[in-house]
Curated annotation (Swiss-Prot):
Reactions that this protein is recorded to catalyse: tRNA(Tyr) + L-tyrosine + ATP = L-tyrosyl-tRNA(Tyr) + AMP + diphosphate + H(+)
GO terms of biological process kind: tyrosyl-tRNA aminoacylation
Key words, A-Z: Aminoacyl-tRNA synthetase, ATP-binding, Cytoplasm, Ligase, Nucleotide-binding, Protein biosynthesis
Enzyme class: ligase
Binding partners and assembly: Homodimer.
PANTHER family given in the database record: TYROSINE--TRNA LIGASE, CYTOPLASMIC (PTHR46264:SF4), TYROSINE-TRNA LIGASE (PTHR46264)
Motif ('HIGH' region): 40-48
Protein name in UniProt: Tyrosine--tRNA ligase
Keyword field contains Ubl conjugation: no
Annotated L-tyrosine binding sites: 35, 154, 158, 161, 176
Domain of life: Archaea
One GO cellular component, as annotated: cytoplasm
Gene: tyrS
Amino acid sequence: MDIDASVENISKDTAEIIEVEELKELLKKDEKRAYVGFEPSGKVHLGHALTIKKMKTLQDAGFKITIFIANLHAYLNNKGTLDELNEVAKYNIKCFKALGLSEDTNFILGSDRMTPEYITEVFKAAKLTTIQRAQRSMALVSRNETHDVAQTLYPIMQALDIHDLDADIAVGGMEQRKIHMLAREILPRLGYRPPVCIHIPLIHGTDGSDKMSSSKGNFIAIDDTPKEIKNKINKSFCPIGVSEDNPVMEIAHYYIFDTHEKILIERPEKFGGNLELTEEELIQTYENEDLHPMDLKNTVSKYLIERLAPAREYMENN
C-alpha cells in the first residue's frame, strides 16, 4: 500500500490527525511505533473497541503497537486502589486481545515504568508546565471539577510516557487532545521529538449522552451476551427521524458498515417488508421516517451480536 493510500486508510473514522504531513514522513520509516493508553476500567466497551480498531489499522500499516495500561495514572485520577486497578488491568488486557490485535502487540503496565530516570523527566516536564495548563489538560479526563495535586501530575506523566515508550504516534479519544497538545509542546523543549497525534471520535452513550462510559453504565461491553446487547440497544436513545448523534446509528456506522456494503432490515409485509440498504440509504430512509426505531434497533442488534461473537468466544475460552 502506498503512502497516500495508507494515510487515507488511517484517516477513516478519525476525528483529526496532527499533523498529516508528519504522518506521511513516519510511513516512510522501516521502524515506527504507535501507542495508546487506557486507564483500567470495569468494562471494555464499544468506545474502547473503536480505538483498538485504529491500532489494528496502524498495525497493518507497519507500526509496532503498544497498549499502555495506565494503572498508576488511574490511581492518581481517583479511580481505585492500586490493587483494584491491577486486577481490572488483567481483565482489560484480555479484552483487548479478544478484539484481534496481533500476537506481537506489546502490553505495558504503567507502574512498571517508574524508574528513577522517568521520575526525573517528570520533574523536568513539571517545571515547564503551569498549574493552570495541567488543570485544563485534565478537564475532559477527570470526573472532578477541581483537581488535587496528584491529578495535575497526570497529563505531565502522560506526555512523558510518549517519549518513554519511544512512540512516534499517540492515539486517543478526543478527550485526550489537550494532553497530547501539551506533549507536542513540552517534549521538544526537553530535547525529544513531538508525536503525531491521532484522535478518535467519542461514541455517544446508549442514553444519548456525549460519551459511552463504564462509570455511567451507558455502554455495550465487548463481552456482553447476545441477550444483554439486544436489551441495551432496545433501551437506547433513538429519536424517530433523527440520525445525527443517534447512538444506534453510530453503532451501525462504526461496527456494521465498516464491513458491510448493505444491511438487510427484516420486517413483516404489513410494515413495508424487508429492506436492503446502504448506509446512505439507511440514513435517508430513517430521516424520512420510513423506518421505525424498533426495526433499526432489531437490525443493529443482530449485526452487532454477530460482530462481537469472536470476542465473546475468546473471552469464554481464555
